[in-house]
From Swiss-Prot:
Cellular component GO terms, alphabetical: bacterial-type flagellum basal body, distal rod, P ring; outer membrane-bounded periplasmic space
GO molecular function: structural molecule activity
Main location: periplasm
Subunit structure: The basal body constitutes a major portion of the flagellar organelle and consists of four rings (L,P,S, and M) mounted on a central rod.
Family stated for the protein in its record: Belongs to the FlgI family.
Name this polypeptide is given: Flagellar P-ring protein 2
Length: 363
């Protein structure tokens, strides 16, 4: 019987009751973030694995027209070495013109593979429609595909998505509010009122009283110098301050697909008794032949004979006293050889009965 593995996500695993963390590890500066860029382009040079869709042909003709090449009226180029693609990139904060970023290229048509292709010059735009980077280069595709003359086909990984390392050049800097105003705001990665207040107290102990204040469960506002050069040194000192974040809320995370169960250390059980068993129903159909006596005038017929067998496992009962943890429950379930699915069913029943002090989240 597969045993249940319980992961206790608890700071009690460390040597101290509360583990100090740097501000930069639990919070980020408001406004200092990456920005997503996207563009539409063409990949050329494919070994017959491209496409001949109408929008690809239209894009191909428009590209030729930009180079002064006009196709004769009514001409439809039959191209199999070109594919229409979407190009995406993430522009890090404070990126400057001339710096390079990685891009991801993915087919949006019926191309079979992008392996061996080259992305032609593609403008990457932000949410405001402005061009912030230009991408171009040879694709690296980890997937592959092969097709035989009889229609047999082999595909490995995903051959219609490729990467270009440092494939886009930044052309424009995105404005950043970092140097404006009298305050810098830190946003916690995990919202918590206690953590926000402890962080503000740590900053005040370092800078002086009333220099920082917790705005809500997420944001901590710190008074900062207006000079940008001083602000960088100021922020460097602040983000390396250490303090003790609050313990997380009592949660149980259950992955129903893998059977993984993660339990926080503050989860407790109220007094409860649980019994859990299983029933198996097996139906077997037998066909019997009914043969009448000679000269009786009867007919030989086939008569179905159903055999139904029901087996029910003995339900094991667990009784818990006040203050016990989920670790005690898992240990008890493991002792009787139950499966992870049994523990999931027990957890759901306990939560519905109000016997679990914490959140039960099933993913």
């Amino acid at each position: 019987m597969k045993r249940i593995v319980l992961l206790l996500m608890s700071v009690a695993l460390f040597s101290t009751a509360a583990q100090a963390a740097r501000i930069k590890d639990v919070a980020q500066v408001a406004g200092v973030r990456s920005n997503q860029l996207v563009g539409y382009g063409l990949v050329s040079g494919l070994p017959g694995t491209g496409e001949a869709n109408p929008f690809t042909e239209q894009s191909f003709a428009a590209m030729l027209q930009n180079f002064g090449i006009q196709l004769p009226p009514g001409t439809k180029p039959k191209i199999k070495n070109v594919a229409a693609v979407m190009v995406t990139a993430e522009l890090p904060p404070f990126s400057k013109p001339g710096q390079q970023v990685d891009v991801t290229v993915s087919s949006i048509g019926s191309a079979k593979s992008l392996r061996g292709g080259t992305l032609l010059q593609t403008f990457l735009k932000g949410l405001d429609g402005q061009v912030y980077a230009v991408a171009q280069g040879n694709l690296v595709v980890s997937g592959f595909s092969a097709e035989g003359a009889d229609g047999s086909k082999i595909v490995g990984n995903n051959p219609t998505v490729g990467l270009i390392s440092s494939g886009a050049t930044v052309e424009r800097e995105i404005p950043n509010p970092f140097g404006r105003g009298d305050y810098i705001t830190f946003n916690l990665l995990e919202s918590d009122f206690t953590t926000a207040q402890r962080m503000a107290d740590a900053v005040n102990n370092f800078l002086g009283p009333q220099m920082a204040s917790a705005v809500d469960a997420t944001s901590v506002r710190v008074r900062a110098p207006r000079d940008v050069s001083q602000r960088v040194a100021f922020l460097s000192a602040i983000e390396n301050l250490e303090f003790d974040p609050a313990d997380g809320a009592a949660k149980i995370i259950v992955n129903s697909r893998t059977g993984t169960i993660v339990v926080g250390k503050h989860v407790r059980l109220k007094p409860a008794a649980v019994t859990h068993g299983g029933m198996t129903v097996a139906i077997k159909e037998n066909l019997n032949v009914s043969q009448p006596n000679s000269f009786s005038g009867g007919q030989t017929v086939v008569v179905p004979d159903s055999d139904i067998e029901v087996t029910e496992e003995k339900g094991k009962m667990f009784k818990f006293e006040p203050g016990l943890t989920l670790d005690d429950l898992v240990r008890a379930v493991n002792e009787v050889g139950a499966a992870p699915s049994d523990l999931m069913a027990i957890l759901q029943a306990l939560k519905q009965a109000g016997a679990i002090e914490g959140q039960l989240i099933i993913i």
